[in-house]
Amino acid sequence: MTDSVVTRFAPSPTGFLHIGGARTALFNWLYAKKHGGKMLLRIEDTDRERSTEAAIGAILDGLKWLELGWDGDVIYQFSRAARHREVAEQLLADGKAYRCYATAEELTAMREKARAEGRTRLYDGMWRDRDPATAPSDVKPTIRLRAPQTGETVIEDQVQGRVVWQNENLDDLVLLRGDGNPTYMLAVVVDDHDMGVTHVIRGDDHLINAARQKQIHDAMGWALPSMSHIPLIHGPDGSKLSKRHGALGVDAYRAMGYLPAALRNYLVRLGWSHGDQEIFSTEEMIAAFDLSSVGRAAARFDFAKLENLNGHYIRHADDQSLVKMFEDVLDHVVPSRDELKAKLNDTTRAQLLKAMPALKERAKTLIELIDSAYFIFADRPLELDPKAQALLTPDNRKLIGQLHSALENVETWSGATTEAALRAFAEENSLKLGAVAQPLRAALTGRTTSPGIFEVLDVLGRQESLGRLKDQAKD
């Protein structure tokens, strides 16, 4: 163990980076940053049947997108199997573990008997003190920890408080399977020790594992890292977060147009509080984060709150950064965006940047931002949505023709000059500005909602604006 803080994020690569896993990574990252320490990344790929390269890629991509960088190389648990076996053999040599030759049928009978009698200890220790010379030759033995049978195993958890287990209720857990492969329980303890992990911060669904892992630490004479078991994330209805509540993977939130800074900010407040403060910069998070302010109760995921928070981050984002995020997110949304991506060039990027102050005021996600920027990329003649189609009546199409003539006389094109021309036209024809602006919006954007009409004219420029009006005008 070192004096400096070392945390670790240790996901299993059996699927995407879950939103709960992302919060665990965030808490580990924040704690390490606050204390000038390191966060290590360990991929717990001992389950060879379920672990996939695609899942590993999704985890690494998710962490990079969330800007939760790790220190050093990624550690792959399976690659350390020889070291795990070495520790099991050492415990065996020291008399702190033993070979168990129980057959699958015997183990099943033990479990059924224990459950029928209401006992949590499922293995009866039949090979704990038996002479190995009596072992059957046709059974490949497991190696089990010789766990204490009396007294208590105690964890002083930084979140859960003092947690106590009666040793009489805990099994002699398996360290090595019959095929020689280490178990998850052993691998975690050995890796945490060898990596110099000082603080284990993980979901409270691992709390029962802590008792078993402490017994391995004690048997090896190793110091136990500080333990913090944080509450799980539940859905809005209070049940465990599942697919029926909506998206689960970080990649899905990326595709839905959430900003990494907004998702980090939202996740940090799930289970942790700092007074009434809701908005945190990364620097503020690092400075304020502490484990003592993490509650024990499960946090509820509120999608509306996340969306509102994301809207805040979009409104306060730098316009140039939003253009880049706009472009980046196109790689992660449905294929229908490919056509839009093909139209990104210096001209449309400049138009997008010019429109961004207006676009970002209305958008809560990057997807909404994309939708509201549609008018920039639309091909002539515009495809009108049903509401715009209904608005462009024969009379309003005649009005569009008159507006085309009025705007054609604007020499220096800008939002201000086109506004002056339209206001003058409305006044001369005894029309309210809204009666002019709405048909104009439909003709210019194909929709009935958009940024301010003068901003639209400014962004599209003289030639494109007049061309679109001519397409929809009726002489």
UniProtKB/Swiss-Prot annotation:
InterPro entries in UniProt: aa-tRNA-synth_I_cd-bd (IPR045462), aa-tRNA-synth_I_codon-bd_sub2 (IPR020751), aa-tRNA-synth_I_CS (IPR001412), aa_tRNA-synth_I_cd-bd_sf (IPR008925), Glu-tRNA-ligase_bac/mito (IPR004527), Glu/Gln-tRNA-synth (IPR000924), Glu/Gln-tRNA-synth_Ib_cat-dom (IPR020058), GluQ/Sye (IPR049940)
Gene Ontology cellular component annotations, sorted alphabetically:
cytosol
Disulfide-bonded cysteine pairs: these are: none
Q: Which keywords does this chain's UniProt record carry?
A: Aminoacyl-tRNA synthetase, ATP-binding, Cytoplasm, Ligase, Nucleotide-binding, Protein biosynthesis
Q: Which reaction does it catalyse?
A: tRNA(Glu) + L-glutamate + ATP = L-glutamyl-tRNA(Glu) + AMP + diphosphate
Q: Motif location ('HIGH' region)?
A: 11-21
Q: Where in the cell is it found?
A: Cytoplasm
Q: EC?
A: 6.1.1.17
Question: Where ATP is bound, by residue?
Answer: 243
Q: Which GO terms describe its molecular function?
A: ATP binding; glutamate-tRNA ligase activity; tRNA binding; zinc ion binding
Gene Ontology BP annotations = glutamyl-tRNA aminoacylation
Principal localisation: cytoplasm
Motif interval(s): 'KMSKS' region: 240-244
| SUPFAM superfamilies assigned to the protein according to its UniProt record, in alphabetical order | An anticodon-binding domain of class I aminoacyl-tRNA synthetases (SSF48163), Nucleotidylyl transferase (SSF52374)
HAMAP family in the cross-refs: Glu_tRNA_synth_type1 (MF_00022)
Q: What's the family? A: Belongs to the class-I aminoacyl-tRNA synthetase family. Glutamate--tRNA ligase type 1 subfamily.
Q: How does it assemble?
A: Monomer.
Chain's role = Catalyzes the attachment of glutamate to tRNA(Glu) in a two-step reaction: glutamate is first activated by ATP to form Glu-AMP and then transferred to the acceptor end of tRNA(Glu).
Protein's recorded name: Glutamate--tRNA ligase
Instruction: Specify the species.
Output: Bradyrhizobium diazoefficiens (strain JCM 10833 / BCRC 13528 / IAM 13628 / NBRC 14792 / USDA 110)
According to the entry, what is the taxonomic lineage of the organism? Bacteria, Pseudomonadati, Pseudomonadota, Alphaproteobacteria, Hyphomicrobiales
